[in-house]
């Protein structure tokens, strides 16, 4: 009987979830990982694991900051954000979520046993509920509050 690679099977199932849910983000990410896995590029996985999250955060930050950089959101609009209660609340929530993300990075580094569950939950959330894959850091931060670890 032929050997079935369980990791490849998991990636295929996750890609299937992305396709079924019409979530191009998950589908493309999983397909790229599949391509890396089944080609000689698999020797680059340590690099992807080490720098992928940082590169992803940089790209996400560029996307979020682009409206300010392009002038679509003006300097006066940024300054006025400190005067409106909804904007002040958004700032406070942004600070809290960033803090949670920091705790999440720490927890994921110090307790790798939780990473698999966080990743599966995040991919399911992205695939099934049209979420975005920033979930592992925030989820890990929330988990760190619940289990009392940093």
UniProtKB/Swiss-Prot annotation:
Keyword RNA-binding tagged: no
Subcellular location: Cell membrane
Alphabetical UniProt keywords: Cell membrane, Membrane, Transmembrane, Transmembrane helix
GO annotation, cellular component aspect: plasma membrane
Matching InterPro entries: UPF0756_TM
Transmembrane segments: 1-21, 51-71, 82-102, 127-147
Family to which this protein belongs: Belongs to the UPF0756 family.
Name the UniProt record assigns to this protein: UPF0756 membrane protein ECA1265
Source organism (scientific name): Pectobacterium atrosepticum (strain SCRI 1043 / ATCC BAA-672)
């Amino acid at each position: 009987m032929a050997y079935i690679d369980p990791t490849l099977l998991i990636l295929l199932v996750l890609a299937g979830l992305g396709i079924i849910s019409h979530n191009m983000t998950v589908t493309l990410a999983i397909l790229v990982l599949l391509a890396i896995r089944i080609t000689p590029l698999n020797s680059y996985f340590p690099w992807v694991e080490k720098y992928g999250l940082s590169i992803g955060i940089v790209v996400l930050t560029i996307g979020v900051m682009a409206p300010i950089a392009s002038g679509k959101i003006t300097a006066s609009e940024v300054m006025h954000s400190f005067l409106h209660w909804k904007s002040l609340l958004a700032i406070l929530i942004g600070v809290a979520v960033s803090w949670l993300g920091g705790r999440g990075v720490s927890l994921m580094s110090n307790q790798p046993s939780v990473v698999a569950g966080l990743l599966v939950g995040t991919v399911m959330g992205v695939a099934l509920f049209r979420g975005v894959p920033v979930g592992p850091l925030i989820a890990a931060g929330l988990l760190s509050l619940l289990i009392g670890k940093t």
